[in-house]
Design a protein with these regions (language model features):
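N-terminal cap/lid segment of alpha/beta-hydrolase-fold proteins
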Residues: 22-53
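Conserved alpha/beta-hydrolase "acid-adjacent" motif
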Residues: 257-263
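Conserved acidic catalytic loop of the alpha/beta-hydrolase fold
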Residues: 120-138
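Catalytic histidine-centered segment of alpha/beta-hydrolase-like enzymes
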Residues: 284-294
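Glycine-rich "HGGG/HGxG" loop immediately N-terminal to the catalytic nucleophile
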Residues: 70-71, 99-114
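Conserved hydrolase catalytic core segment
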Residues: 138, 143, 147-174
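Short beta-strand/loop motif that positions the catalytic acidic residue
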Residues: 244, 250-252
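Short, surface-exposed "cap/lid" segments of acyl-processing enzymes
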Residues: 54, 59-93
Length: 312
């Protein structure tokens, strides 16, 4: 059988059951996003959205380790186009960004902790809810950034019927290695976040205007003043690329210090799906979607969603 796979370098560029209808907040008068509250196994999960009147597809974005959905995917910078949600909505997609437990507008649960399996279950439930909002459309495309990419991969393996494609952005690992549990205190630390942490993902000034960094620092600190407490990283071992049958796009910036090209190649080769692509964004680092590589990042995902079939 022919392998439908591609390695691409992009040219640089400036258990969802019946439930009550979710709470929703309409778009703000100043053009802010819609906000929904989706119940996931009895816990309220905040979901942000920008949606055209007649979408042709749906996409769910999952944030990483430190910051929540809105600063990561709906960043507002005067004079710059950096909102992922707005860019996808402008191209006809209903774009959603989730706040996982303990992030942004989603409260912690009684445990105070968030584990990979709990996060993956919430993401799966949100995907199910999104599908009910767009019953005539294909199942959503799932995009995870950094730590969120691993959880997106877990969801794609455990619940492939909930999504059409999965995009793993800003993450790669050697599949022959295993994740381990880090030591955690008896109770969550509830540590304050810092402006230094907010700026840390922006590495190259060549693709990151200072206005973008300043806006992200302000909006990230407002959304997530307290660091979420995580544990159970050994659960990430549920992400086994050899079990991933969903069409997948693996994408990272060429200057992302957290991604080794060799590891990305090993992970790409291990993916079971024949329908897979690997995209490298030249000059981009870990926050490629917020930098001057924003348009190239958006285009790579939309091109993957719209790829023609290998056979006619």
């Amino acid at each position: 059988m022919a392998v439908v796979a591609a390695i691409v370098t992009v040219a640089s560029a400036s258990a969802l059951a019946r439930q009550a209808p979710p709470k929703t907040t309409p778009p703000a008068p100043n053009g802010g996003p819609e906000r929904f509250t989706v119940q996931s196994d009895g816990h309220p999960v905040a979901l942000w959205a920008r949606r055209p009147s007649a979408p042709k597809g749906a996409v769910l974005f999952v944030h990483g380790r430190t910051w929540s959905g809105r600063p990561d995917f709906d960043l507002q910078v005067p004079g710059y186009k950096r909102s992922v949600l707005a860019s996808f909505a402008a191209q006809g997609y209903a774009a959603y960004a989730v706040d996982l437990r303990g992030y942004g507008a989603t409260p912690r649960d009684a445990s105070g902790w968030l584990t990979p399996k709990r996060a993956a279950a919430d993401i799966s439930n949100v995907l199910g809810w999104i599908a009910t909002q767009h019953p005539a459309l294909p199942k959503p495309t799932l995009v995870g950034w950094s730590r969120g990419a691993v959880m997106a991969g877990m969801v794609a393996i455990a619940s492939p019927q909930r999504l059409t494609n999965v995009v793993l952005f800003g993450f790669a690992f050697d599949p022959e290695l295993e994740f381990g549990d880090a030591e955690v205190p008896p109770k969550p630390d509830m540590l304050k976040n810092s402006t230094a942490a907010a700026a840390s993902d922006f590495i190259s000034p060549k693709v990151t205007p200072k206005e973008v960094v300043a806006a992200f620092v302000e909006q990230a600190m407002n959304a997530d003043p307290v660091l979420a407490d995580l544990k159970g990283d050994g659960e990430f071992n549920a992400f086994k690329p050899a079990q991933l049958t969903t069409p997948v796009l693996i994408m990272f910036g060429s200057d992302d210090p957290g991604v080794a090209v060799e590891d990305a190649g090993k992970m790409f080769a291990a993916v079971k799906s024949d329908d897979k692509q690997l995209v490298v964004l030249p000059g981009a680092d870990h926050a490629a979607h917020l930098e001057d590589t924003h348009d190239a990042w958006v285009a790579a995902i939309i091109n993957f969603i719209n790829r023609p079939p290998a056979k006619r």
